[in-house]
C-alpha cells in the first residue's frame, strides 16, 4: 500500500526476492550450453535484489467507489505518468488499461495510482490513491492474478474505495531471451530463427557501433559456440550479455534510434519496450504528473492560451506557471499547487524590469505592510473559517492523520498553520550517529556542494553571496567556499523547522530586511536578491562532526514572524525542533564549512538539473567528511 512497512516485512520480501533471483541465475547456468568463454562469463554475472532490473506489466482492472461518477485513473511512476480512459458513470468503473513500466537498477519501484472524479469543464478532483511497490510482484506466485488495494483519501487516510490491479514482472532471464528474439527478428530475413553471417553483419550495423561493425567476423565466431555457421537465439543472447558488459556493441536503439547509455540491462529493457508496447488497452502517456494527466479539456485549453508548459528544472516566463518537484521517497514527479493569479503577479514583479522599478518605488513597503496585516488577520478567531477551504485546495498534499490535534482544536488559522505532528510521524535517520546530517524541514530541497554550484544551477540574483546572506555580525570566512542547502517551505507544508545536526547553539543574529516571496519565480530572477535582502535570523550551531553550521531562517511574503523555541547555549540533537514560521511560504538555508559534509548524491543530482527534491524532516542529508586529526594510519 505504500504506507510504510515494518523492517521485518521489508527483510522478508528482500529475502524472498534474493531466493528467486538466485533461481534465475541457476536457470541461466543450466540453459546455456558449453563451457566456452562467452557462456562462462555470462553465467558469472550476478543480479542482486538491490539493483534488480526488468519490465513490469501493470494492468488497472477497475475499482469500487462509494458513489457514482465518471472515473479516471492515473499511474505515476518515476518521472512519468499515464492515464486510463474515462469510465461510464458508475460506482464500479472498469478500465482494463495496461502499461509496461521499466524497473531500472537503483530506479523507482513505487507506483502511485490516483483515482479522479471527472468534471467536463473544471479540473478533475482526486478522490483516492494507493501505492504499490512493483518489486513485491517479483516474489509472487506465477498464478497470482488480480489484487485489491485500499484507496485512501489523500487528506485523511480514510478508505474511500478499492482498486483492482494485476502486475507481472518479467525476470532478467526471460527479458534477455525475449530481447534476443526481437533483435534477431529485425534481420532474420528468411525467418528460420537463426542468423547467417550476412544477417549478423546487418544487425551489427544497426547497432550504430563503428568498432563492432569492423569486428563482425570476430564477434560472429565468438557467438557461434557450436561452429555450425549460424547464430541461434541462445547464442545471440549470450553474446549480447557478455559484450555489453565487456565492450558494449549497442550504441543506439535499432527501433527508435535513441542513443543508449552503457548500462547493459537498462539498454536491453529500453529496446524491449520499443519492440513491444503490448496488445491490450494501453494507457495514455506523455505526462509528468498525475495532476497534469487528469486535467479536463477546458483546463487544457486555458493552459494552451497562456502558452505555459510543463517541464522540470529552472523555468522562467510562462513556463514558471507550474512548479514540478521530485518526491524523494517515491522518486516520482509531483506538481506543486499555486494559484494562477498569484503566479501571474509574481512573474510581473520578479521577472521583469518594470517590476524591479516598482520595488525601488515603494513596493517593498507595500509587501511589508501586507504581510503585517495578513499576520494579524490570521491570528484572529474569524480566520479559523479559512481552514476548511485551505485543506480542500491542498487536499492531496496535507495528511491530517499525521497532525497531533484534531481540526476543532485550532482556534485561529495561524494555530493550524504552525500545527504540531504526532510523535514518530517524522523518523530521524541514523539517530545515534551524529556524523549524519538530516533534513531540517518538510520542504522542497536544493543542495549544492559549493556556493558556485548554487549560483550556476539555481540562485540567479546578481548579488548573492555567503557574506551577504550571513550579514556583518557573523564571521563568514569559514563558510565562504562551503556547502549550501536550501529548504523551501510551501504554504501546505508542516511549518516547524528542526536542527539538521547535533551541537550547541552559539548565538542568534537577527537581520532586518524585505519580505519578498521565496517562490522559485523570485529566486530564479536576476532582478532581485531574495535571500540576501529578506528579513532573516541566523543561528550558529557548533558541532563536533561538521564544525560550525549556519542555520538561516528567512521570512517571506505573508510571513510576519519567525519564532524560536531554543536559546543560546542550548544543546540540540538532530531532529529537535528549533522554531516555526507563521502564515506564508518561507525558507531555511544551511551553510556548512568547506569540506565538512558530503551531501547525498541523489540530492546533488536533482539540484544539478535545477529540480527541487520533496523531502520530510529527518531524512538523511549527508555525512561528515572524516577529519584528518581523527584518522589513524595503519602500519
UniProtKB/Swiss-Prot annotation:
- Family in the record: Belongs to the phosphatidylserine decarboxylase family. PSD-B subfamily. Eukaryotic type II sub-subfamily.
Which spans are transmembrane here? none
**Can you supply a Gene Ontology BP term from the record?**
protein autoprocessing
Loss of function: phenotype: No visible phenotype under normal growth conditions.
Q: What protein name does the entry list? A: Phosphatidylserine decarboxylase proenzyme 3
The entry's Ca(2+) 2-binding residues are 224, 226, 228, 235
- A GO molecular-function term, please? calcium ion binding
Q: Which organism is it from?
A: Arabidopsis thaliana
Query: Under which EC number(s) is this enzyme classified?
Result: 4.1.1.65
Q: Which HAMAP family match?
A: PS_decarb_PSD_B_type2
Lipid group attachment sites (N-myristoyl glycine) = 2
Written domain comment of the UniProt record: The C2 domains have an essential, but non-catalytic function. They may facilitate interactions with other proteins and are required for lipid transport function.
Q: How does it assemble?
A: Heterodimer of a large membrane-associated beta subunit and a small pyruvoyl-containing alpha subunit.
Q: In which pathway does it act?
A: Phospholipid metabolism; phosphatidylethanolamine biosynthesis; phosphatidylethanolamine from CDP-diacylglycerol: step 2/2
Gene encoding this chain?
PSD3
Amino acid at each position: 500500500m505504500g504506507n510504510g512497512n515494518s523492517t521485518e516485512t521489508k527483510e522478508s520480501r528482500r529475502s524472498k526476492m534474493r531466493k528467486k533471483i538466485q533461481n534465475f541465475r541457476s536457470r541461466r547456468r543450466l540453459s546455456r550450453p558449453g563451457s566456452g568463454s562467452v557462456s562462462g562469463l555470462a553465467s558469472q554475472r550476478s543480479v542482486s535484489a538491490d539493483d534488480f532490473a526488468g519490465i513490469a506489466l501493470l494492468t488497472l482492472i477497475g475499482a469500487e467507489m462509494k458513489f457514482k461518477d465518471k472515473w479516471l485513473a492515473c499511474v505515476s511512476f518515476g518521472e512519468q505518468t499515464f492515464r486510463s480512459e474515462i469510465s461510464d458513470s458508475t460506482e464500479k468503473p472498469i478500465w482494463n488499461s495496461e502499461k509496461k513500466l521499466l524497473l531500472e537498477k537503483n530506479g523507482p519501484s513505487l507506483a502511485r495510482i490516483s483515482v479522479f472524479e471527472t468534471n467536463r469543464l473544471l479540473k478533475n478532483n482526486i478522490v483516492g490513491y494507493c501505492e504499490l511497490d512493483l518489486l513485491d510482484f517479483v516474489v509472487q506466485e506465477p498464478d497470482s492474478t488480480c489484487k485489491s488495494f485500499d484507496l485512501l483519501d489523500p487528506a485523511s487516510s480514510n478508505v474511500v474505495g478499492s482498486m483492482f490491479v494485476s502486475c507481472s514482472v518479467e525476470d532478467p532471464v526471460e527479458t534477455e531471451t525475449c530481447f534476443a528474439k526481437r533483435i534477431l527478428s529485425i534481420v532474420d530475413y528468411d525467418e528460420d530463427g537463426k542468423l547467417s553471417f550476412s544477417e549478423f553483419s546487418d544487425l551489427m550495423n544497426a547497432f550504430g557501433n563503428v568498432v563492432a561493425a569492423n569486428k563482425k567476423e570476430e564477434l560472429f565466431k565468438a557467438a557461434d559456440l557450436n561452429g555450425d555457421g549460424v547464430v541461434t537465439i541462445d547464442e545471440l543472447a549470450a553474446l549480447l550479455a557478455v559484450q555489453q558488459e565487456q565492450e558494449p556493441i549497442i550504441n543506439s536503439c535499432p527501433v527508435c534510434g535513441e542513443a543508449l547509455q552503457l548500462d547493459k540491462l537498462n539498454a536491453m529493457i529500453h529496446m524491449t519496450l520499443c519492440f513491444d508496447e503490448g496488445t491490450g488497452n494501453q494507457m495514455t502517456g506523455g505526462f509528468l504528473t498525475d495532476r497534469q494527466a487528469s486535467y479536463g479539456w477546458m483546463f487544457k485549453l486555458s493552459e494552451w492560451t497562456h502558452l505555459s508548459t510543463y517541464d522540470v528544472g529552472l523555468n522562467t516566463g510562462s513556463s514558471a506557471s507550474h512548479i514540478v518537484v521530485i518526491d524523494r521517497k517515491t522518486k516520482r514527479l509531483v506538481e506543486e499547487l499555486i494559484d494562477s493569479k498569484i503566479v501571474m503577479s509574481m512573474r510581473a514583479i520578479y521577472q521583469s524590469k518594470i517590476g524591479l522599478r516598482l520595488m525601488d518605488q515603494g513596493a517593498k513597503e507595500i509587501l511589508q505592510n501586507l504581510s503585517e496585516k495578513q499576520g494579524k488577520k490570521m491570528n484572529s478567531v474569524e480566520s479559523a473559517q479559512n481552514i476548511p477551504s485551505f485543506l480542500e485546495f491542498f487536499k492531496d498534499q496535507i495528511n491530517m492523520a499525521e497532525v497531533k490535534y484534531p481540526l476543532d482544536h485550532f482556534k485561529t488559522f495561524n494555530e493550524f498553520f504552525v500545527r504540531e505532528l504526532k510523535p514518530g510521524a517524522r523518523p530521524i535517520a541514523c539517530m545515534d550517529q551524529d556524523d549524519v546530517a538530516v533534513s531540517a524541514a518538510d520542504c522542497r530541497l536544493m543542495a549544492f556542494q559549493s556556493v558556485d554550484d548554487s549560483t550556476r544551477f539555481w540562485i540567479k540574483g546578481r548579488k548573492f553571496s555567503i557574506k551577504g546572506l550571513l550579514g556583518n555580525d557573523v564571521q563568514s570566512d569559514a563558510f565562504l567556499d562551503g556547502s549550501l542547502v536550501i529548504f523551501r517551505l510551501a504554504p501546505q507544508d508542516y511549518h516547524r523547522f528542526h536542527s539538521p545536526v547535533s551541537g550547541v547553539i552559539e548565538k542568534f543574529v537577527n537581520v532586518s530586511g524585505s519580505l519578498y516571496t521565496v517562490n522559485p519565480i523570485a529566486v530564479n530572477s536576476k532582478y532581485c536578491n531574495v535571500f540576501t535582502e529578506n528579513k532573516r535570523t541566523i543561528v550558529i550551531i557548533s558541532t563536533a562532526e561538521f564544525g560550525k553550521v549556519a542555520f538561516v531562517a528567512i521570512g517571506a511574503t505573508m510571513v510576519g514572524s519567525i519564532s524560536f523555541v531554543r536559546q543560546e547555549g542550548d544543546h540540540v540533537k538532530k531532529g529537535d525542533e528549533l522554531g516555526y514560521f507563521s502564515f506564508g511560504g518561507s525558507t531555511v538555508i544551511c551553510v556548512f564549512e568547506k569540506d565538512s559534509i558530503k551531501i547525498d548524491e541523489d540530492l546533488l543530482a536533482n539540484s544539478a538539473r535545477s529540480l527541487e527534491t520533496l523531502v520530510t524532516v529527518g531524512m538523511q542529508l549527508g555525512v561528515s567528511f572524516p577529519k584528518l586529526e581523527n584518522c589513524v594510519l595503519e602500519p
